C-alpha cells in the first residue's frame, strides 16, 4: 500500500493511495494480497470511492443519503486479501470503512479501525454538587467530540472537513437519542437524558470539561454515569458486504462503526472471527457502534460469528433475518406487486430468477396452502441507482399465484436467501438491547457464548410482518452451553407477530435449550409464543441473591399457544419459581 503513496505516519490523507492500490489490484484479474505497513493511516471521505447504494435497515429510499463514500472498496474482484499488517486506520467524516461488492473469496484481516469523530458523544458525569442552592454537573468529553458552548447550549461540531471548512455533522445538546452507561456496574440501557433540563448556565472549563448549572436544587445522583448521545439517521453502513460470496473478517479491532454496523446483504457465506467490536480503552469512549454491530439481511449459505467481543453498541449486537415484502397488487395471474413496508429498508432487489419464495398470511404468520413458487422474472430496484421505484417491485413466478394470497394480507419471503448460522464463543456486554436476534429456517447453533447484563432479551426470535418486516420462522434452533449472567427477562424470548395464535399451527418449530448456565435475578427465563417443539433440558439455573433473600416470584417459564414442550433434567437453586405458565 505504501508504494502507492499511503502514509503510515498518519500525517497526511492516505485515501487517494488506498484507492489507487485497490484499483490496480482489480486490474490484475488474479488472486491478490493488498498489504498495509504497520502504522496509522488517515482516511478522509472527500476523495474516497463513491457509490449509489441502498442498504437494509438504514435510511431506505431517502435520496439525501443515496451516495455512500467507502474507504476500502473491493468491487467486482475475486480472491482478495486486505491485510492490515497491524495497522490502525483512522476514518474521518461520514463514510463506510470497507465494502465487498459483487466479489468472491474476500478477506479483511489484521487491522484496527477507528473514527476520529464518532457521531456519538459519550459525556461522562465527572462530578455533581450544589452551589448557592443550585445543582450542577461537570461533564468530561472525549477528545474526538469537538464542541462549542453557545449561551445555555452546547453545539457538537463533529470534526471540520479540511475541504469545506464545515463540520461533517453537528447537533445541539442531547441530540436525538440517548442511552446511559454505568462503567462501574458494566451495564448500558436506554433512558431519558436529564443533562439539558432546567439549565441556568453552561460554562466551558477547558480541557474538555463543561459545567452545567441548573435552576433545580437537588444534587444530581448520576456521578460516574456516561450519557451516550447521538443523532438517529443511519446514513451509511459501517461496513458493507453485498452480492458477494465467501467473505471473511478476521483478527480485527472494530473500535467504532459510523452510522450503522457491518451489513451483509444478499451475499453468501460470511465469516466473522476474532473481531473485537469494542471502543479503544484509551479513547475515553464507551460506544463502539452507532447502532447494531452485525446485521445480516437476505444472506444465504452459512453465517459464522465466532470468538469475538461485542461491547458498547447502540442497538442489537447481532441481527440475522430476511425481509417480508407485502403484497400490494396483482398485475397478472402469475405475478405480484410487492412493497417494502418499513421506511429503513428499500431500494435493493429482494429476488432473482431461480429463487424460491414462500407466501405467508400476516394474521397467522404461517404459510398458505401450496405456499411455494420459483421466481422467473423481477422488475424492480437494482440497489445501485434510482431509475425505478425504490419501494415496490413486480415479481413473476413459475406458477399461478396461490388462491389464498390477499392484497395487504399476505407477505412474501425469499427462502433461498436464508442462511444456516453458527454463533459460538463470543462475549456480549454493555448492550442496551437484545444480544442475538435470529430468524432463519436453516439450522442455527448458538453455543459457548457469554451474555452479561443484557438490558433486553439475550436471545430474541421474532418473525415480524407488522413493524420491522424481518423474516422468517425458525425450524432448527439450538442454544447450547452458553452462560447468561445478570440478564433482563425474559432471557430467551420468542415473539412472532401473528395476531391469530393456534397451537396446532405454530410459527416456529424445534427449539432446544440445553446445557446452559443462567445466573439470574427475579426474571422469567423463557417466554415463548407459537412454538411447536420446545425442549429445555440439562440447564443450571442459579439465583444471584443469597439464600437469605425472599424467594423469586417470576415464573421461569411462560408459553403462549405452544405445544410439545419438554422441561427436564435441569438444576434449580432453592428460591426460584419453577412454575410453567401456559395458555
What does each of the following model-derived ranges do?
Residues 91, 115-117, 126, 142-204, ...:
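Ser/Thr/Gly-rich low-complexity blocks that favor extended beta-strand/coil architectures
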Residues 182-234, 369-372, 378-422, 429-430:
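Small/polar beta-strand repeat architecture
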Residues 190-284, 292-296, 303, 309, ...:
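Alpha-solenoid helical-repeat scaffolds
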Residues 19-28, 42-81, 90-109, 117-135, ...:
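Extracellular beta-strand-rich solenoid/capping regions of secreted or surface-exposed proteins
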Residues 1-35:
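Acidic Gly/Asp/Thr-rich repetitive segments characteristic of extracellular carbohydrate-active
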Residues 31, 91-97, 117-121, 235-238, ...:
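Short glycine/acidic-rich loop motifs that flank beta-strands on beta-rich extracellular proteins
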Residues 34, 72-75, 80, 87, ...:
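Solenoid scaffold repeats with emphasis on beta-solenoid/beta-helix
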Amino acid at each position: 500500500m505504501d508504494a502507492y503513496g499511503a502514509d503510515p505516519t498518519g500525517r497526511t490523507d492516505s485515501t487517494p493511495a488506498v484507492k489507487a492500490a485497490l484499483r490496480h489490484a482489480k486490474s490484475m484479474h488474479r488472486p491478490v494480497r493488498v498489504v498495509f505497513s504497520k502504522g496509522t493511516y488517515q482516511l478522509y471521505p472527500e476523495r474516497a470511492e463513491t457509490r449509489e447504494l441502498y442498504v437494509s435497515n438504514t435510511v431506505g429510499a431517502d435520496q439525501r443519503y443515496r451516495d455512500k463514500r467507502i474507504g476500502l472498496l473491493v468491487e467486482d474482484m475475486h480472491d482478495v486479501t486486505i491485510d492490515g499488517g497491524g495497522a490502525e486506520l483512522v476514518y474521518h467524516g461520514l463514510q463506510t470503512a470497507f465494502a465487498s461488492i459483487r466479489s468472491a473469496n474476500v478477506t479483511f484481516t489484521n487491522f484496527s479501525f477507528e473514527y476520529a469523530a464518532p457521531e456519538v458523544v459519550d459525556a461522562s458525569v465527572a462530578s455533581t454538587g450544589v452551589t448557592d442552592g443550585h445543582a450542577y454537573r461537570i461533564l468530561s468529553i472525549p477528545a474526538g467530540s469537538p464542541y462549542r458552548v453557545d449561551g445555555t447550549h452546547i453545539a457538537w461540531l463533529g470534526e471540520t472537513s479540511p475541504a469545506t471548512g464545515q463540520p461533517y455533522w453537528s447537533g445541539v445538546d442531547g441530540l436525538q437519542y440517548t442511552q446511559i452507561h454505568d462503567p462501574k456496574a458494566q451495564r448500558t440501557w436506554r433512558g431519558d437524558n436529564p443533562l439539558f433540563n432546567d439549565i441556568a448556565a453552561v460554562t466551558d472549563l477547558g480541557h474538555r470539561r463543561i459545567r452545567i448549572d441548573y435552576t433545580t436544587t437537588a444534587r444530581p445522583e448520576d456521578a460516574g454515569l456516561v450519557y451516550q448521545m447521538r443523532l438517529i439517521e443511519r446514513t451509511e453502513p459501517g461496513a458493507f458486504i453485498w452480492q458477494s460470496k465467501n467473505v471473511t473478517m478476521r483478527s480485527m479491532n472494530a473500535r467504532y462503526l459510523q452510522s450503522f454496523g457491518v451489513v451483509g446483504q444478499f451475499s453468501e457465506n460470511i465469516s466473522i472471527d476474532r473481531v473485537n467490536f469494542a471502543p479503544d480503552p484509551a479513547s475515553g469512549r464507551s460506544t463502539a457502534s452507532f447502532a447494531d454491530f452485525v446485521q445480516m439481511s437476505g444472506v444465504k449459505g452459512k453465517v459464522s460469528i465466532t470468538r469475538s467481543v461485542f461491547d458498547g453498541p447502540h442497538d442489537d449486537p447481532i441481527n440475522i433475518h430476511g425481509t417480508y415484502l407485502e403484497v400490494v397488487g396483482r398485475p397478472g395471474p402469475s405475478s405480484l406487486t410487492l412493497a417494502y413496508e418499513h421506511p429503513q429498508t428499500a431500494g435493493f432487489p429482494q429476488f432473482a430468477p431461480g429463487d424460491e419464495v414462500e407466501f405467508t398470511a400476516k394474521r397467522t404468520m404461517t404459510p398458505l396452502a401450496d405456499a411455494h413458487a420459483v421466481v422467473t422474472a423481477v422488475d424492480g430496484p437494482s440497489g445501485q441507482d434510482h431509475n425505478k421505484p425504490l419501494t415496490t417491485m413486480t415479481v413473476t413466478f413459475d406458477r399461478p399465484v396461490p388462491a389464498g394470497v390477499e392484497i395487504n394480507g399476505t407477505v412474501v419471503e425469499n427462502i433461498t436467501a436464508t442462511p444456516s448460522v453458527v454463533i459460538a464463543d463470543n462475549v456480549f456486554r454493555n448492550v442496551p438491547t437484545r444480544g442475538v436476534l435470529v430468524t432463519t429456517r436453516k439450522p442455527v447453533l448458538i453455543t459457548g457464548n457469554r451474555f452479561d447484563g443484557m438490558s433486553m432479551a439475550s436471545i430474541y426470535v421474532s418473525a415480524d410482518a407488522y413493524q420491522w418486516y424481518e423474516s422468517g420462522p425458525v425450524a432448527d434452533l439450538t442454544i447450547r452451553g452458553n452462560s447468561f449472567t445478570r440478564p433482563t427477562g425474559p432471557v430467551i424470548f420468542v415473539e412472532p407477530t401473528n395476531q391469530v395464535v393456534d397451537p396446532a399451527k405454530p410459527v416456529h418449530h424445534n427449539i432446544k435449550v440445553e446445557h446452559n448456565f443462567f445466573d439470574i435475578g427475579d426474571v422469567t427465563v423463557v417466554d415463548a409464543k407459537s412454538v411447536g417443539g420446545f425442549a429445555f433440558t440439562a440447564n443450571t439455573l442459579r439465583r444471584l441473591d443469597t439464600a437469605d433473600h425472599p424467594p423469586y416470584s417470576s415464573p421461569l417459564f411462560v408459553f403462549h399457544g405452544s405445544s410439545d414442550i419438554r422441561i427436564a433434567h435441569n438444576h434449580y437453586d432453592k428460591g426460584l419459581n419453577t412454575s410453567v405458565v401456559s395458555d
